Amino acid sequence: MKSYTPYFMLLWSAVGIARAAKIIIVPPIMFESHLYIFKTLASALHERGHHTVLLLSEGRDIAPSNHYSLQRYPGIFNSTTSDAFLQSKMRNIFSGRLTAVELVDILDHYTKNCDMMVGNQALIQGLKKEKFDLLLVDPNDMCGFVIAHLLGVKYAVFSTGLWYPAEVGAPAPLAYVPEFNSLLTDRMNFLERMKNTGVYLISRIGVSFLVLPKYERIMQKYNLLPAKSMYDLVHGSSLWMLCTDVALEFPRPTLPNVVYVGGILTKPASPLPEDLQRWVSGAQEHGFVLVSFGAGVKYLSEDIANKLAGALGRLPQKVIWRFSGTKPKNLGNNTKLIEWLPQNDLLGHSNIRAFLSHGGLNSIFETMYHGVPVVGIPLFGDHYDTMTRVQAKGMGILLEWNTVTEGELYDALVKVINNPSYRQRAQKLSEIHKDQPGHPVNRTTYWIDYILRHDGARHLRSAVHQISFCQYFLLDIAFVLLLGAVLLYFILSYVTKFIYRKIKSLWSKNEHSTVNGHYQNGIRNGKYKGNGRVKHEKKVR
């Protein structure tokens, strides 16, 4: 009997090829932590049969892989210069310069790099020939929207930061939805609601008049057609995949085309290298504390490093600290400095007692995944909002880097280590985070496949972006109701006055009788007229 198995296998293979898509990812030009997420996502997409391309500047370090390919272009940064630039920003912040000033400078570099990409005709023509099915935008660098428009390809947002932008279009009642960078929770008093409103207005003004116009000028410079505003491009996203989670985020209204996929990098702990395993195994009695401020913060200021070293040296626990730079003079004997460490594997070790961190989103999700309490010292960006949520959820303590003392840091560490409520809350949040349909990376690939299957999934998109400001806030309805109320007032006023005059007229006629013996002007005939006495009328014979 003839076997049809090879034919079925060939048919199945053909179906798989037909469903495969070409996807291009446009990561930000700096922040290696964002690139880690996209590499992980690209590998997951490869496993589902898709071909993924990362659009990166020349000289940016990334390990080669069969799971993705690279499209290089001459940009303003390579890995060395972008790291030096970022560290200079951190030194400026530590020296007292406003964080907002540094963020504006970062935005300027984003747009300069975007100008170089859009103006690179060889790059753009090469990308057009690829005929991509989908482009993934990281809104930290909005050039992805411009590239998608230039290529004429469907696009979706994958936000690697803790950011739920108003541009999504979801309702955001300021009474209980804290604005990004407000450092507020969903429980606000009057003054906090005032602050939240102020931050919201400043954010909208900043986006409308500072951020988006920079990219619009690039589109105008190169005469990109059809002409579109950045608002239209941002609103045109098929899907918004946000790196947050129900365990971390405050409950808020959302939309069908917004999905939470926070925790892409989380995974079970792997065995430690032999030298680290011996080190942590020697911390059986008191355990150990892990200290790391992420790949983006390599050099702390001397003042902060000394405060950390002093507080950590007073702990009975062992301490392992990811550290680069000059060794603090007051470093304790219990503290081990190391330039790189397997953070996830250490967080998953049974002897860990606490994590001292900058509050980076990837680090916090790994910490939550393993149920470890945390003390956070935010430095910039979404670190503050992330740690605000961690503290509000009872999983850790937030400290301000520019005001914290050695004693306060020591007390906070002792509190999260010795107070069991912090570990209990961390473990509960870990349960909530894991109790969802599939790992975050699998949920992400599912939704990417979904919008590919349904040609952008326009049925998920709300009509909020097709209505005007007046329609959204029902100002036209309010105007009509107000106008109706005013008209009703004048009509009722007119009718009331008319009825009053009629009644008064009838009453007046009844009072003006000329028959003897009846009232005339309210006075008995022949008695009084006004205040004086009057004569009787002559009798009629």
UniProtKB/Swiss-Prot annotation:
It catalyses: an N-acylsphing-4-enine + UDP-alpha-D-galactose = a beta-D-galactosyl-(1<->1')-N-acylsphing-4-enine + UDP + H(+); N-(2-hydroxy-hexanoyl)-sphing-4-enine + UDP-alpha-D-galactose = N-(2-hydroxy-hexanoyl)-beta-D-galactosyl-sphing-4-enine + UDP + H(+); N-(2-hydroxy-hexanoyl)-sphinganine + UDP-alpha-D-galactose = N-(2-hydroxyhexanoyl)-beta-D-galactosylsphinganine + UDP + H(+); an N-acyl-sphingoid base + UDP-alpha-D-galactose = a D-galactosylceramide + UDP + H(+). It comes from the Eukaryota. The chain crosses the membrane at residues 472-492. It is found in: Membrane; Endoplasmic reticulum. Gene3D superfamilies: Glycogen Phosphorylase B. GO terms for biological process: cytoskeleton organization; galactosylceramide biosynthetic process; glycolipid biosynthetic process; myelination; neuron projection morphogenesis; paranodal junction assembly; protein localization to paranode region of axon; response to immobilization stress. Residues 526-541 have a biased composition (Basic residues). SUPFAM superfamilies: UDP-Glycosyltransferase/glycogen phosphorylase. Keywords: Endoplasmic reticulum, Glycoprotein, Glycosyltransferase, Lipid metabolism, Membrane, Signal, Sphingolipid metabolism, Transferase, Transmembrane, Transmembrane helix. Its EC number is 2.4.1.47. InterPro entries: UDP-glycosyltransferase, UDP_glucos_trans, UDP_glycos_trans_CS. Residues 1-20 form the signal peptide. Glycans are attached at N78, N333, N442. Residues 518-541 are annotated as: Disordered. One of its GO terms (molecular function) is UDP-galactose:glucosylceramide beta-1,4-galactosyltransferase activity. Its main location: membrane. GO terms for cellular component: endoplasmic reticulum; membrane. Catalyzes the transfer of galactose to ceramide, a key enzymatic step in the biosynthesis of galactocerebrosides, which are abundant sphingolipids of the myelin membrane of the central nervous system and peripheral nervous system. Galactosylates both hydroxy- and non-hydroxy fatty acid-containing ceramides and diglycerides. PANTHER family: 2-HYDROXYACYLSPHINGOSINE 1-BETA-GALACTOSYLTRANSFERASE (PTHR48043:SF54), EG:EG0003.4 PROTEIN-RELATED (PTHR48043). Belongs to the UDP-glycosyltransferase family. This is 2-hydroxyacylsphingosine 1-beta-galactosyltransferase. It comes from Mus musculus. The gene is Ugt8.
